[in-house]
Amino acid sequence: MRVISQYTAIFFITLTLVGCFFNNSDVQRWEMATQGTTSFALSRDARFGLFFVKEGSNAANTNSEIKSGLHFWDLVDNKELTYFGAQDQHDSTVSHITISDNSRFAITATQTNFAVWDLGMGISEGLWSISDGIIRDVDIASNGQQVLLGLSNGKAIYIDLATGRRLEFLAHREKVNSVALSANGKFALSGGNDHFAYFWDTQTGQILQTFEHEKRVSRIALQRDGKYALTADGGNEAFIWNLKTGDKITELSTFARQQVFSSARFSDDGQYLVTGSPAGTVMLWNTLSGKKQEQWRAEPLKDARPPTAVVYDVAIDKKQRVVSATSAGIAQAWLIE
C-alpha cells in the first residue's frame, strides 16, 4: 500500500511538472485534415497553409471527407482556396512543402520529383524529376523561378527554372538534411550529416560562412533580412549565428539530452525563433539570449499510438501569435505571453 502511494505521488508530481512546462490552451484551431497529412507548410505570416493528404492515411478516421492530394487553405477566412490534387500520375507521397517568402509560389517534393505551384493563380508551373539522389528538403525564391534541393547523395542543387541553369554545391560529404534559400534566390544555407552547415552564394557556389557541429546538422533556418542563421544538430546543440561576421551569437538553452527540430522559423524582425519537434513540441526562443520563452504541445493525430504529431512548420501571424502545422492535419495558434 505504501509503494502504491509513493507511485501515485510521483505520478501526480510528474503531471504537475508537465503542466508547468507546457501551455496547451490554444486560442484558435483549424482541423483541416484530421486523417493526417504527410507534409504541411505555412506561409511566412501564417495566412495560408498548403498540405498533402495521402489516401488511406490513418485509416481509423473513416468519417473524414478530405480528399487525397494537395490542398491550399486560407486560415484567416477558414476555407479551402484550391484543390491541386496529385503531384504526379503515380499519386506519389509529397513529403516536403515550402511556401515562398511572399506567399505567391510553393514547391512540393516527393522522393524523386518536385513541382512548383502558382498559388495566386491556382495552377501548376511544372514537374521536374531528380535521378541522382533522394530529395530530403526544398526551398523556393519569391519569384518562383529559383529552387534549392537537398539530396541524399550530399549535393545541394540550385536550379533557375527560367534559364535552366543548374549549380551543384558539392561541399557536403554526406546527406544534406536541410536547406534554406534567401527570398531573392541569391544565397543559400545547407546542413548535412557531415556535421557542417554552409552559407553560400548561389551564383558562384562560393562558401561565405562555415558552421561546424559535433553531430549531424538536422535543421537550419535563415532570418529573412539576412541577419541570422540557425543550425541545429541531432543531439542537443542549436546555435544562432551572425551571418555577416560568422560569429556565434548564442546557443539555445535546453536541458534535454536530445533536442531535435523538425521545423524552425525566425520572426520577421529577428527577435524570436520558433521551433517545432517530431514529438509535437512547439517552442518560442529569444534570438539574442537563446532562452526559451514559451512552450506548447500540439494536438496529437487522432488514434495514433503513441499520441503525438510531427510539427511540420511554424510561423508568427500578424496578430503576433505562434502558429503550428502538424502531421495531425491541424493548425493551432497560441498567444505569446
Regions found by a protein language model. Name each.
Residues 2-7, 14-337:
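WD40-repeat beta-propeller superdomains and closely related acidic/aromatic-rich repeat-like regions
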